[in-house]
Amino acid sequence: MKNLVTSAINVSLKYKELFLLLLINIIVFQNYWKGIAIPPWDFIGGGMVEQYGFYEYGSFFNPPSWFPNVWFGIPEYQMLQDGGWFLPTLVVAEFLNWYPENAARLQAVLILIGSVGFYGLSKYFVSNRTFALLGAVIYSFNPAFFSNAQHYGVVRSAVLIPWLLFIMTPRLIIEKWWAIPAGSLIFFQLITGSYPGNLVSSIYTCAIFFFYYIFFENRRKIYAIRVLIIFLSGLMMGLVRYLPTLLDLGSYPQNISNSSDLGYWNFSTFIYPFVSDNLIGDPSMRSIYLGPLFLCLIPISLFVMARNRTIIFWVALVFFSLIMMVSSDVTDLFRSILPFTDISRFGMTDWRTTFYISIIFITLLTFQKINELSFITLIISELIFLIILLFIWIIGTNLNYSESAISYTFKVLVSTNISIILYIVASILLKNERALSIVLFLVIVLQIVFYIDYYNKNKLTWESKEIDQNIYGQSFRSIPRVIEYPLTYRPARILLTPPPFDEWQYRTDYRYNKFWLTGEFGALGYHNVKDNVAYRSLEARLQKNSDPVINYLLTQGLIITMTDDADVEALINNCLVNNFNCQTVEDAEIQQIEFNRETELYSIKSNRDFIMLQNEMYSPVWSARLCENEECVSISSYPILDSLRAWKIPKGNFEFKSEAKTLYNFERWFIFWVGSALSLISTLILNKKLSRNS
């Protein structure tokens, strides 16, 4: 028993930093862990049900191609933010069920994993574990985890990037046999788990770190080869998600503007609350909270830069990130020069994690050198700190923050500044490194208290106890399935409110999410379909009191036959007015036999060629086989009026079977497995070579 207790104590001491990070996570996200709270808004919206649908209707290696339940039907490959390819989602969906409570618990786990990754990364840049712990603690309170808690991709990107940067550190990537496969897997998950804008900023951040690492590395060739393998193999694996979209870019807009930037109105959130009535815009797109420690150390950092040029690198990265986060002519220039940066819709949230990482390392490197500064330098730093306080007071009053908010902010900053002074005094008086680490640990504890209090005052964006938020009308897990396949034909689609619609109404109606669970067929939904030509062309129609194409899509499964595609809207009108008498082509008869989620079966008899128009959404994923007397021919669908699915049918007596198949499915999986093999085989070869050389 005594040995067991001793072993437990030794383990606790050995991993005390990780235990502290776990404790912080449990305290902050205790209501996630209890299952009584989740992030609000989008977390329970499209992102929740898209991930539910991915594993309800398919699996990782056999993903669904088509979701018929919302927006008149949508292809899976178009939903770049669905999160189904994120492996932790697979684990939860398969073993725990993808309920809101479990999704929130997963998010808490991921944030813990991200902070542990940053701890490992910090140890490369600072001299001892306590400083690394300080970095990990600050990263645990990354604004991405709180202001953007509803956005799965933003959080997951911020979780994974520290791990990838950690794997890229020269000593680890060269000396650890598992570094390449682990790095490939992490980059693959970064590709599939991040929003596109976050992914691009993460790749640029990795590139910047690569040049930093290789500058100080003697074994540059060995290092560069290993990094190249990680990113090449990870990219090949990630194309399982992106290849169909990349080869269908013609369906998407090419010029994307930055619709969420860092401006004066939200710049105040670097220290003030981001959930406040005096601010404008989406509260989840505001926060750049830096924490009190960095702000108090700014004056000292100015002097430390003269002695530690490494800080200049981080300062440069801060300014680069800021440029990408704001809207300016310089930003537009960078977006026009740097490939793929122009796809960023939300510059502030896309580049904020890079900005935050830089801020943390400036903080750590400054703190590490703080005891080397002269007394005069520290006095000057305190005078500059007073100027910073005046600047913060001016911002608070000009933006109409309450007196209590301004007063509390000053108390936090002054208390932090006093703790820094006490640490400096301790570093002079205490010669024992262990004793000084205890003082630093107390500074860390004070910062933890301030961070927790700050985010508890800003819970609107990251904690809601209305787990189902009235979106479903009942709890997520109690909604019964109504539709069971196969059907003879598709039932009418459900439009919850009559047109006309304003843009926000047809783009952001959460209520349609329940149809993913019931299996019914919703007309609209809160999903990112606005960029696809087929869906974008419906927007003007939804803004009318009545439109033939919308009405046609709403009806139960229906076929119009025609000889050409002239006056299609008139034909649709006649079809709907004349009691669905729509097969007007003589000697052409169509009968539906079966309707399934991703397939349809018809019997077709015709003495002439004709066009078959379905009241279904067009997507290039849909193709068909026409079989007559065991001889089959494949045909592809094509769009009419940009949105409707049409087929050119030759004369004959056929069994017509249409099926949704994701484009380039064989090619993307072939590339995925080649990337996996590249990662594993290169690991074996390079480690054998390294062993021989050593």
Report residues per predicted region.
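Hydrophobic alpha-helical membrane-insertion signals
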Residues: 4, 8-78, 458-466, 471-512
